[in-house]
């Protein structure tokens, strides 16, 4: 994707580690994920969202690890909790358009929450990212989190042996390469076009 001379250089937001993953174009900047987010929070402790809190009514959709696919949202394992219970775990509430990241199995994969349900909450093993869209496009950030650049940072710092996991505090510190917004838009369009071609070939 070509760079345009007319595009401004990205402003550096927050501190950047000297140990950056790779060299990037001059107008891009490395920015920690927490500095690209209005809010980052993880799901409730297991005792705060148990089967006894589930409901058969379509009230507040619970985002399960199985919904966070490696290639997008997977609409399976559908479970709901009540509006009343969701109000007791406000930091774990999620809106459509937010990004959610799995903390395990495998750690670091991310999806954009769809608008198929009116309201959502996280399971205990996921993290929500409310994107600062004035700095980075949601689709671009989602692609960046799912890239090898981000995954290498995650897997260099995972915990556990049988159930390898990451954490909210670690995810906040990992770095994202941020181009100017217009260039982000062109990159997203190019990636989506390539995915579309792959889907046509695989059909």
Specify the residue positions occupied by each region the protein language model found.
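Short, well-ordered beta-strand elements within core beta-sheets of diverse protein domains
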Residues: 20-23, 85, 127-131, 172-178
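A short beta-sheet element
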Residues: 64-65, 83-146, 163-165
């Amino acid at each position: 994707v070509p760079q345009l001379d007319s595009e401004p250089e990205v402003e550096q937001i927050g501190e950047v580690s000297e140990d950056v993953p790779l060299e990037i174009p001059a107008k891009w900047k490395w920015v920690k994920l927490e500095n690209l987010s209005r809010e980052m929070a993880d799901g409730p402790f297991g005792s705060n969202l148990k089967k006894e809190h589930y409901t058969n009514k379509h009230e507040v959709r619970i985002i399960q690890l199985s919904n966070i696919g490696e290639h997008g949202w997977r609409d399976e394992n559908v479970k709901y909790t009540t509006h009343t219970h969701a109000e007791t775990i406000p930091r774990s509430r999620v809106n459509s358009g937010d990004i959610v990241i799995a903390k395990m199995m495998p750690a670091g994969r991310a999806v954009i929450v769809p608008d198929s349900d009116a309201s959502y909450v996280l399971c205990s093993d996921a993290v929500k990212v409310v994107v600062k869209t004035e700095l980075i496009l949601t689709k671009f950030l989602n692609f960046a989190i799912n890239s090898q650049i981000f995954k290498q940072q995650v897997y260099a710092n995972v915990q556990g042996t049988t159930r390898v996991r990451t954490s909210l505090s670690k995810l906040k510190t990992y770095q994202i390469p941020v181009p100017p917004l217009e260039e982000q838009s062109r990159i997203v369009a190019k990636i989506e076009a390539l995915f579309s071609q792959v889907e046509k070939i695989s059909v």
